[in-house]
């Protein structure tokens, strides 16, 4: 889910004990062990998010029923949140690492949507034009919105050092938000809501099917791990100089909700995997039992 925005301060403002490579590579001033742990957990969470989609691609190839296993609204909610994340990366003028990560998320979502439509319409090609047109229209709207939002105000906020699965991060200081920061905060909140709502259709789909076949649990397990590590990285980070812990948490609340809030819903999906897997195993063994 998103990374906090970190200041692009001169190295003179960083204590001499800070780790040089963290500053050089990420632009992050790690002042103590808490900051170093925050950076480490953040980087690991990026790897978790990057690896989460590959098991689902493999599962889709093996089972061929991805269109039945995954909810379309789940995928649309996910790509909507990631698209807000990508737009936010331009608004916040983030480091290349964040921008590349955000682009990867959207590309991975597009691949997953492509697989979904492929398996759904491979036997009914005549019905394929409508959803493709809808997706293309959505992408065109996103492409048009990006330059408009980028020109909404001056880039007054410093760059971010790194970012997780999806939300725009906003500098939380004592000074008032600029107009562009307010826009970024709103986009981050929308992205958070989209991530929360996206799980509900998938939970409903699993419940109606009474099965999770065709879904790779690694997809949700790695996302849960990534969101947990991201949330911890936010909580471990020291507030900016002169900023209280309460103010820090308040300014990062939407992104904490977007990362840690979805854990409850992902836990429900995990329980569905456990329950329906046992039900499937029991139904397969039942004909073998003596009458």
Swiss-Prot record:
Residue spans crossing the bilayer: 38-58, 72-92, 99-119, 135-155, 183-203, 215-235, 255-275
Organism, scientific name: Homo sapiens (Human)
UniProt cross-references to Pfam families, sorted A to Z: PQ-loop
Note: May play a role in the export from lysosomes of cysteamine-cysteine mixed disulfide (MxD), the product formed upon treatment by cysteamine of patients with cystinosis, a disease characterized by the accumulation of cystine in the lysosomes.
Major localisation: membrane
Topology of this chain in the membrane: Multi-pass membrane protein
Motif interval(s): Di-leucine motif: 288-289
Parts of the chain on the Lumenal side: 1-37, 93-98, 156-182, 236-254
GO molecular function: basic amino acid transmembrane transporter activity; L-arginine transmembrane transporter activity; L-histidine transmembrane transporter activity; L-lysine transmembrane transporter activity
Glycan attachment positions: 10
Protein name: Lysosomal amino acid transporter 1 homolog
InterPro entries on file: LAAT-1, PQ-loop_rpt
Lineage, broadest ranks: Eukaryota, Metazoa, Chordata, Craniata, Vertebrata
PANTHER family hit by this protein: LYSOSOMAL AMINO ACID TRANSPORTER 1 HOMOLOG, SEVEN TRANSMEMBRANE PROTEIN 1-RELATED
GO BP, one annotated term: lysine transport
Chain ranges on the Cytoplasmic side, renumbered to this chain: 59-71, 120-134, 204-214, 276-291
Family statement drawn from the similarity comment of this UniProt entry: Belongs to the laat-1 family.
Domain PQ-loop: 34-100, 184-243
Record carries keyword Isomerase: no
């Amino acid at each position: 889910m998103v990374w906090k925005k970190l200041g692009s301060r001169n190295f003179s403002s960083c204590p001499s004990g800070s780790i040089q490579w963290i500053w050089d590579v990420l632009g992050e001033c790690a002042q103590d062990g808490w900051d170093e742990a925050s950076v480490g957990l953040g980087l690991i969470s990026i790897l978790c998010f990057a690896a989460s989609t590959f098991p689902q691609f493999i599962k889709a190839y093996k089972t061929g029923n991805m269109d039945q296993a995954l909810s379309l609204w789940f995928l649309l909610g996910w790509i909507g949140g990631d698209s807000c994340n990508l737009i936010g990366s331009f608004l916040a003028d983030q480091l290349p690492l964040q921008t590349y990560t955000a682009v990867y998320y959207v590309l991975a979502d597009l691949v997953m949507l492509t697989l979904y439509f492929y398996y759904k319409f491979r036997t009914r090609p005549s019905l394929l034009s409508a959803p493709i047109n809808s997706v293309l229209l959505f992408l065109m709207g996103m492409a048009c919105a990006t330059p408009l939002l980028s020109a909404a105000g001056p880039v007054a906020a410093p760059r971010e050092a790194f970012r997780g699965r999806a939300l725009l991060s906003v500098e939380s200081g004592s000074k008032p938000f600029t107009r562009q920061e307010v826009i970024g905060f709103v986009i981050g909140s929308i992205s958070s809501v989209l991530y929360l709502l996206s799980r509900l259709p998938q939970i409903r789909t699993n419940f109606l099917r009474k099965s999770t076949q065709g879904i790779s649990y690694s997809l949700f397990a790695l996302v849960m791990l990534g969101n947990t590590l991201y949330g911890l990285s936010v909580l471990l980070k020291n507030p900016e100089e002169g900023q209280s812990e309460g103010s820090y948490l308040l300014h990062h609340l939407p992104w904490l909700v977007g990362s840690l809030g979805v854990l409850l819903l992902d836990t429900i999906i995990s329980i569905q995997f456990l329950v329906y897997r046992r039900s499937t195993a029991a139904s397969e063994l039942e004909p073998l039992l003596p009458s």
